[in-house]
Structures are given as C-alpha cells and as structure tokens.
Amino acid sequence: MIAYARITGQALDNRPIKRNRSAGLLLFRRKPRLEVLLGHPGGPFWRRKDDGAWSVPKGEIEDGENELMAARREFFEETGYHPTGSAIPLGSLRQPGGKQVFAWAIEDDWDPEKLISNMFSMEWPPKSGRIQQFPEIDRAQWFGLELARKKILKGQAELLDRLEQALSSPPR
C-alpha cells in the first residue's frame, strides 16, 4: 500500500494522501540592521503563545506546483502581499512534526499593518457545535535576528542561520 500511495498519491481506498511538504518566504530588510518578517498563527490555540510561536509565512504545496510558486502563493494568501525581488534559496528542513519545509528569502520592506490573511474554519469551543473563522496569521512583525530566534518556531530557527550565511557569502 505504501508503494501504491507513492506512485498514485492515493491510498487503496482512493483517499488522497496528505502531502507533508510546505513552502514559504522569509522577507528580510536592512534598517540598518538585518530584520526578518515573521507571522503569528491565528486561532485559539496560538492566542496566548508568543516566544517560539511565530513562523515564516508558508503553506502546503499543491499538485502541479513547484516549491517556489507555492511559497509565493502562500505568502500572498497569508499576508495579502506579493513581495518583489529575487528569491534567495534557503533550502529545505524537516520540522519536528515531520513536515518538510522549503524556504526562500526575499529582500522587501512591506508594512505588516497592511496584513490581510486568509481564514480557516474550526469548531470552537471544542464540542460546542459552533463553527468559527480565524485568520491563518493574526499579525506579522519585523524582528531583529536576536529576537527572531526567540520568537520563531524551534523547527524553523535554522532558516535564520541560513539567511545570515547566504547574505554573508560573496555573490556567485
């Protein structure tokens, strides 16, 4: 069954296999020190979480989509903004939950006050029968690298190191 699922993308009972891959963009600016833009997840689970809760705006890669296309689409869906500039590849990493994340960095100076996030629905409170909508990202903010290392999800912290390394390497 595993081989069948890998080839067809479906389990034997025709259920689609959940893809465990996502892609995202890490915006950065130099004002004059290096800062990165992180998003805080929306919804009741994340409401009171701060340190270790912020994320690179990212999401699932759709069928037929390459990783960079997915990263750009997801950034727009979660922020309402299309960043300009060239994408610097940061590679991929595997988060503690097993999801593989592909990431790029783009230099841009977007105003997070203009955040317009897409929404998701969930039953809240649990077992209440009430379906409520929440933003995927409830706020976005620029952080210097030292503070960003405290704010970002532990499984994504390596992306900050990769960005620093990419920016300090001579151009090819």
Language model feature labels by segment:
Residues 31-34, 43-46, 62-63, 81, ...:
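Short, charged/polar surface micro-motifs in flexible loops or helix N-caps
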Residues 56-90, 144:
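The catalytic Nudix box helix
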Residues 92-129, 141, 163, 170:
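Active-site-adjacent beta-strand/loop module that shapes the phosphate/pyrophosphate-binding cleft
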Residues 130-149:
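Alpha-helix-centered segments that form part of catalytic cores
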Residues 145-172:
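Charged phosphate-binding loop/patch that engages nucleotide di/tri-phosphates or the phosphate backbone
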